[in-house]
Amino acid sequence: MPASFLASLRAWIASSTIGQRILLALALGLLLITARVISKSKGTMPPGPRGLPLLGNIFQLPKLPWYRFTEWKEEFGPIFSLNFAGTPVVVLNSHEVVGDLLERKSTIYSDRPRFIMAGEILTGGMLIVFTGYGKVWRKLRRAGQEGLNVRASEKYQPLQESEARLLTTNMLREPAEWDAHLQRAAASSIASAVYAWPPLTKSDDGLVHRIDELMRRLVMAGLPGRYLVEIFPIMKHLPTWMAKWKREGLEWHRRDTEMFEGFYDNVARFMASGKYKPSLTAGLIERQEKNGLSKKEVSWLAGTMIGAGAETTAASLSVFMLAMTLYPDVMRKAQAEIDALVGRERMPTFADRPHLPYVCALVKEVLRWRPVGPVGVPRRTSEDDWYKGYFIPKGTLVIANVWAMNRDPAIYPDYDEFRPDRFLDASGNEIDIAGTHGQGHVTYGFGRRICIGMHVANQALFIDIAALLWAFNIEAPTGPDGNPILPSRTDFVDEGLVFRPAAFRCKVTPRIDDVATMLATLEKNA
């Protein structure tokens, strides 16, 4: 996030005139002085690292800021403050602080900073993750929850089981292409839930790529400093002939709306014919009038679920593959649990889920060990607040350091080890970890902004992971000396939308010789 800001700032400084630089310095100075006067008149903000005059702490943040946030947590405590060129920032690093503020004071801490390009121009105010805490957000959120809550998500399980069988078959045919299979399976699984589409194939790669590009465009547009309109909001009102960025953004919005409304129309036609399967979009159309949503709002709510859900699920499955490669004992223990219950005559199903506690704990550990979203999208305080003697002014950016909370040694001893047993008691029953909404981790977020699709995501991860463990061994390749070539446990890449393992090699081999015959029989009888 800050890395993009710095790059944009340096580029602007290099191309600007001396007069423009002086005006920017004066504006920043006035903003900083005003902020300090107002802040000091009401109280002291939480402690934090010293920064530069005017620019504050923005030059102190690396490309992956959660590592630095976690270091500062050790120095300044579970809540500390920063200054981003005059904008106050508070970073939350513990379950207790997040519970006190984002959960119990959610009316103050549920708003977003204004994302003009990403949240207004490119999406017309209909991307729920960037939408401010108001009437539009509430009706979108309510409609989405109705279609993706625990009970509603169960309707998508037959489709997800079918996707898991296809994933296993594809992995058997082309084991070296395992990462591509995971990405296709993740996109196909969420698409089946959103639109009841049949399984995606290579012929659908263009469509999936277009949705992925849309999500990446939105993420990049949301980075601080990417567009000057975020610094000078009045620029939004420039005519399009004067603002190429605005003209291009509105054209992208038109194209993306046309695509999503086309998906909506297809579902509506199937509903009219009476031949349709349950899907998020079908439910949204059925309740459209009750929820007060327009066709465009339903189309965007459903369509953006695919991009966000596919990327995060695929990244989590990649973390699973990395963990199995590094922790073969964990893999064998999960396989033994599956074998004892399921046997070899059938694949795991959702009916087995309550009887596979170790596999369920393994899914939780995947999400905790290497969260694909190490910091949440920033929030903004909607009014002044005081917490434990500290003043948090209205308009403060609030960042939840998910990375630090998922690695809190007081809650997760040996936090850097992949150990599903941490979620089970001595009898093998699941342990509830306070402040995690029954998830065992905080990767899905907090309060009124908690991930709307987490139940569908949990289902997809469970059935895909159970199927892969049932069918395959996942191991490190061996070198010429016969020793395993282990992948890096720390080499990860930030792709904007997700944080995922860098490319690595692993060996995927069938656990039994006739697994292909068994899969063909299961698919025929499905």
From Swiss-Prot:
Spans through the membrane: 13-33, 115-135, 306-326
Membrane topology designation: Multi-pass membrane protein
Claim: Heme is one of the keywords in the record: yes
EC assignment: 1.-.-.-
Top EC category: oxidoreductase
Pfam family, one: p450
Alphabetical UniProt keywords: Heme, Iron, Membrane, Metal-binding, Monooxygenase, Oxidoreductase, Transmembrane, Transmembrane helix
Record-level Gene Ontology MF annotations: heme binding; iron ion binding; monooxygenase activity; oxidoreductase activity, acting on paired donors, with incorporation or reduction of molecular oxygen
Pathway the protein acts in: Secondary metabolite biosynthesis
Keyword set includes Membrane: yes
Cofactor(s), by name: heme
GO annotations of cellular component type: membrane
Positions with a binding annotation for heme: C451
Protein location: Membrane
Family membership: Belongs to the cytochrome P450 family.
Task of the protein: Cytochrome P450 monooxygenase that is able to use delta(6)-protoilludene as a substrate to produce delta(6)-protoilludene-8-ol.
Protein name, as recorded: Cytochrome P450 monooxygenase 58
Species this chain originates from: Postia placenta (strain ATCC 44394 / Madison 698-R) (Brown rot fungus)
Lineage: Eukaryota, Fungi, Dikarya, Basidiomycota, Agaricomycotina
